[in-house]
């Protein structure tokens, strides 16, 4: 039976073709974003990564350097300055009307 199943063990030479192209230099680029569905502040309508309207108007002030994002326990995100002004009048989330509680804020 072994005689019937002999395998030809000749080495096959594979012809090496030159590569179609060669990468000589590669500049990697990365992109990231906040893990939230809505990327605009619902109060000022600016992109959450941009300055809020208050900081855009006062670019000379130190507050513009501290324009951060604030998340509530409901997972809605707003500019810290925007939600702070909102909370002076009503202590609820502007989007779902639940009582506002800070989950985290900062970059």
Swiss-Prot record:
Q: Which residues bind Zn(2+) 2?
A: 74, 76, 93, 96
> GO cellular-component terms in the record?
CLRC complex; cullin-RING ubiquitin ligase complex; cytoplasm; cytosol; nuclear SCF ubiquitin ligase complex; nucleus
Q: Does the keyword Transcription regulation apply?
A: yes
**Does the record bear Cytoplasm in its keywords?**
yes
| Residues that bind Zn(2+) 1 | 41, 44, 79, 82
Which molecular function GO terms apply here?
cullin family protein binding; histone H3K14 ubiquitin ligase activity; ubiquitin protein ligase activity; zinc ion binding
What domain of life does the UniProt record list for this protein's source?
Eukaryota
Instruction: Return the InterPro entries for the record.
Output: RING-box_E3_Ubiquitin_Ligase, Znf_RING, Znf_RING/FYVE/PHD, Znf_RING_H2
Q: What are the subcellular locations of this protein? A: Cytoplasm; Nucleus
Annotated metabolic or biological route of this protein: Protein modification; protein ubiquitination
UniProt binding sites for Zn(2+) 3:
52, 55, 67, 81
**What main location does UniProt list?**
cytoplasm
- For this entry, list what GO says about its biological process: heterochromatin formation; protein ubiquitination; SCF-dependent proteasomal ubiquitin-dependent protein catabolic process; ubiquitin-dependent protein catabolic process
Annotated RING-type zinc fingers sit at 52-97
User: Keywords, A to Z?
Assistant: Chromatin regulator, Cytoplasm, Metal-binding, Nucleus, Transcription, Transcription regulation, Ubl conjugation pathway, Zinc, Zinc-finger
Sum up the protein's function in the record's words: Component of E3 ubiquitin ligase SCF complexes, which mediate the ubiquitination and subsequent proteasomal degradation of target proteins. Seems to recruit the E2 ubiquitination enzyme, like UBC3/CDC34, to the complex and brings it into close proximity to the substrate. Component of the rik1-associated E3 ubiquitin ligase complex that shows ubiquitin ligase activity and is required for histone H3K9 methylation.
Assembly? Part of a SCF E3 ubiquitin ligase complex containing psh1, pip1, pcul1 and the F-box proteins pop1 and pop2. Instead of the pop1/pop2 heterodimer also homooligomers of pop1 or pop2 may be present in the complex. Component of the rik1-associated E3 ubiquitin ligase complex composed of at least clr4, cul4, pip1, raf1 and raf2. Interacts with cul3.
Q: Give the comment on domains.
A: The RING-type zinc finger domain is essential for ubiquitin ligase activity. It coordinates an additional third zinc ion.
Q: What is this protein called?
A: RING-box protein pip1
Lineage of origin: Eukaryota, Fungi, Dikarya, Ascomycota, Taphrinomycotina
State the gene name recorded for this protein. pip1
